[in-house]
Amino acid sequence: MSKFDLTAKNCQYLDRHLTFPLLEFLLQKNIYDQTSLLKFILETVSKTNMVDYTMDIRERLNMGNELPEELTKRRSNVLVKLKELQTEVAPLMKCMEELKNPDTMKDSKSIVHALQQEFDFKYDIIRSAQKLAKYLYECGNYRDSISYLYICLLVMEPTDKNYLNVLWGKLAAEILTLNWPTALEDLTRLRDFIDNHNFSPIEVLQQRTWLIHWSVLVFFNHAKGRDLIIEMFLYKQLYLNAIQTMCPHILRYLATAVIINRGRRNALKDLIKIIQQESYTYKDPITEFLECLYVNFDFEGARMKLHECQTVIINDFFIIGCLQEFIENARLMIFETFCRIHQCITIGMLADKLNMEPDEAECWIVNLIRNARLDAKIDSKLGHVVMGTQPLSPYQQLVEKIDSLSVRSEALTVLVERKQKAKTQESGEGNWKYY
């Protein structure tokens, strides 16, 4: 299933520490050769200070469980450097502990002024705090790194040349500690900084592309993320432009968010337009599922793509947690679209369209009716589902009628074109044989 695997593309825009969970996930899926993947992880982790993780990978590669002299020396150097940086930063930590209510101060200038007045504070010590935070991060000690990064953000002015690096570091550390509420706050702060800073066009495009990939990790793990990903990726033009220019594969995650978010069906029309525009550069079973269903009205194609979607999602680190929701909502979308064209449906036909057994399909419809999500009746003797109608205002009736006629017209047009194309191919017309 490596054909649809996006790990290599996604990892290009992630910090190396953020790639480790993705690579470990791939190891479990057996999509690639295990030894080659472990060697790649070992090569990547060797660029950090994560000595214990390095040893773990070496053991899994059967390279022995004894610590090589090189790693022993490296661990010793890491501990010495860590002690040195902690000593440098100790005065700042003491000042911050004694400073009253730093969180309530208006801005970094107020905090720096208070520190200078009360503790003879030197701004250069912030550089040491940043180095220590970075060093702890490289050791895999993300929680302690967050503490120092938080202080850096309190004291640093946004004009500081290192401010952007600290914002990125804080977001990465919050993601790696699975602190999603704070990660979302940091994501918003970083996005505001990128959007309002004076970057060159190339720089801002690069920054937005990185932010798009990092934000997927946050959005699919935060309660509000499914709405926020649609707002940012589909309706913030600057980010949509970045997706279309640099990373159209992100459409997989946008499409997934729209499919599982029943309250945002109004976004489907805009999403499908983008998917069609970008289909020449990127497509996968998830984007093709929407095209089959809403562009071609190809229910058989949609059924087959839904089956492929399940395999894609199972092997995608970002969206594997959405699998059941995706299947449920995708089936509902097929059902709703099918019912707009056919008012009376056999359970057998419906089961076929939804990749379900007839008994399972009947039970599924019963649950929809029971949960007041569907106005329909089941005729068990005939094996039919008869769609009901709810009283509508004259205006709503007109809108529904036009909408329904539009859907039916498009479906009929597609069917006629498909049949005509088949006839043309059979007769050999239009092949320009004798040009």
Curated annotation (Swiss-Prot):
Disulfide bonds: none annotated. Residues 219-392 form the PCI domain. The keyword Hydrolase does not apply. One of its GO terms (biological process) is formation of cytoplasmic translation initiation complex. SUPFAM superfamilies: Winged helix' DNA-binding domain. PROSITE patterns: PCI. Keywords: Cytoplasm, Initiation factor, Protein biosynthesis. Component of the eukaryotic translation initiation factor 3 (eIF-3) complex, which is involved in protein synthesis of a specialized repertoire of mRNAs and, together with other initiation factors, stimulates binding of mRNA and methionyl-tRNAi to the 40S ribosome. The eIF-3 complex specifically targets and initiates translation of a subset of mRNAs involved in cell proliferation. This is Eukaryotic translation initiation factor 3 subunit E. It comes from Culex quinquefasciatus. The gene is eIF3-S6.
